[in-house]
Every structure is written in structure tokens, then in C-alpha cells.
From Swiss-Prot:
The chain crosses the membrane at residues 7-23. Its main location: membrane. GO terms for cellular component: cell division site; plasma membrane. It comes from Methylomonas methanica (strain DSM 25384 / MC09). GO terms for biological process: cell septum assembly; FtsZ-dependent cytokinesis. The keyword Cell membrane applies. Residues 29-98 form the POTRA domain. The keyword Kinase does not apply. This is Cell division protein FtsQ. Essential cell division protein. May link together the upstream cell division proteins, which are predominantly cytoplasmic, with the downstream cell division proteins, which are predominantly periplasmic. May control correct divisome assembly.
Length: 249
């Protein structure tokens, strides 16, 4: 069997297709056309061609639809497959891909349901937020991360990483590079306490922070970036007093 065409066809969605010459291997009516439909981001067309060619050689009447379905379903990041024989000489395949929304550890990604998926190339997803945590806690941690993401977004902050260690202590990292140690006890409250002080500190002071440790009952510890100029804490304290007076009024 010789392939004379395997090309991306322009139509609704994205289509891969190939045309085949008559095959002496096909005892019955040969398959001349295969169309594969889908909005492809991660599925490689050469991989599809390689795994489907042996089945297509079986001919129109003997090609195994279940086998094709299984072969494609086993590819990374394929969510659903629909395979149909189309008279007189074609097979149509529709592929729906998974939609990863975060990275999970070093080698996996999660979809919106919190299901673990193993892609061929994790580097394709380096721009997605990262979660690390105990195995089996993927769905729970994804839901927590969504909440943290929303809270930070309200403060014009972008969450880049969310880490939970074996002791269930939280640590997050923002797209700006700022790291926050939130601890194991009341981590959300710890984060909120820090965020409440941002308006008083001002954007310039927050931008100079390298990390914040919120695991203190009445405050937090700050590690400043190198070459941070001296901060006028007296002015900040005075500003705080004025803000509190205005709130009482």
C-alpha cells in the first residue's frame, strides 16, 4: 500500500487525510480515503499515520473499528474518539483532545476534572501553573488552587506555583517571583492577612519582596531582594494611622 497524500485539509475544524492506491493486501474493497477531524494541538499526524496504516490495509469490509478506536484512545491527551466506516471507500475518525489546565509535578498535567494525564513532552505545558502535592490529592488540590488563584487575581497577582508538602504545609509562588510560605495551620487566613497589608505597603515595597513567611500569629517575615533601598517604615506607619482614622470616620 502506497500513500500518495497525507495533508491538512482546510475545512471546519482541522482535518488530516490521506488517499491510497489500490492495494493487493486488501482482499476486499480497498479503503481509499481516511479523514481525521479534530482541533489538534497535541496529537501528532505522523503518529496517527503510523498506527493506522496496518489497519487500513485490511480493506473496507475487514478494517476493525474497535481496534482503531483503542489505538487512538491510548495516545496521550486523547479524550474521546469516534470511528465510522463511510461507503463506499472511506473511514472517518473524530478525535477530541484533553484540555490540560495545570502541570502536576515534573511529568504530568491535570484537566479541569483533576484527572492525571501524561503527555509525551511536558515542556509543551511550561506556561501552565504548577501544582505539586501528595499523590491521590490531585482533585482536592486543584480545587484549592482555583480558590487561591481567584483571591490573588482580585489583588492583580498571578499565581504561578502551588506546593503542598507531605506535612500538608502550603507554599505558593507568584508570576512576579514572590514566594509565600503559608504553613499548615490556617494557610488561607495567613495569606489573607498578608494581602490586607498590601495597600498600606504600596506596590513598590511589595515588588521588592523576594519571599514572605506568614507562619506567625501576629505578622509575617519578609526577605527582601538584593539591593533593596532602605524603607521608610515611619512613613508607612503614619500612612497606616491615617487610613485607620479615615475608616473610623
Amino acid at each position: 500500500m502506497k500513500f500518495i497524500l497525507f495533508a491538512l485539509l482546510v475545512s471546519a475544524g482541522s482535518w488530516y487525510g490521506w488517499k491510497q492506491l489500490h492495494s493487493q493486501d486488501a482482499v476486499s474493497k480497498p479503503i481509499r480515503y481516511v479523514k481525521i477531524e479534530g482541533a489538534f494541538q497535541y496529537t501528532n499526524k505522523e503518529t496517527l499515520k503510523r498506527i493506522l496504516t496496518p489497519e487500513m490495509k485490511r480493506g473496507f469490509y475487514h478494517v476493525d473499528m474497535d481496534a482503531i478506536h483503542q489505538l487512538i484512545s491510548q495516545l496521550p491527551l486523547v479524550a474521546a474518539v469516534d470511528v465510522n466506516r463511510v461507503w463506499p471507500d472511506a473511514v472517518h475518525i473524530k478525535i477530541t483532545e484533553q484540555k490540560p489546565i495545570v502541570r502536576w509535578g515534573d511529568k504530568a498535567v491535570l484537566n479541569k476534572q483533576g484527572e492525571v494525564l501524561i503527555p509525551d513532552d511536558i515542556d509543551e505545558f511550561k506556561n501552565l501553573p504548577l501544582i505539586t502535592g501528595p499523590e491521590g490529592q490531585e482533585k482536592k488540590l486543584l480545587e484549592i488552587m482555583k480558590g487561591v488563584y481567584i483571591v490573588l487575581k482580585d489583588k492583580s497577582m498571578q499565581l504561578a506555583e502551588f506546593h503542598v508538602n507531605d506535612r500538608r504545609a502550603w507554599r505558593i509562588k507568584l508570576a512576579s517571583g514572590l514566594e509565600m510560605q503559608l504553613g499548615r495551620k490556617a494557610p488561607l487566613e495567613n495569606m489573607q492577612r498578608f494581602l490586607k497589608t498590601m495597600d498600606l505597603l504600596g506596590e513598590e515595597q511589595v515588588a521588592m519582596m523576594a519571599s514572605v513567611d506568614t507562619r506567625y500569629p501576629n505578622g509575617y517575615a519578609v526577605t527582601w531582594k538584593p539591593d533593596t533601598p532602605e524603607i521608610d517604615w515611619k512613613a508607612i506607619a503614619e500612612n497606616y494611622k491615617n487610613v485607620m482614622k479615615e475608616r473610623r470616620i
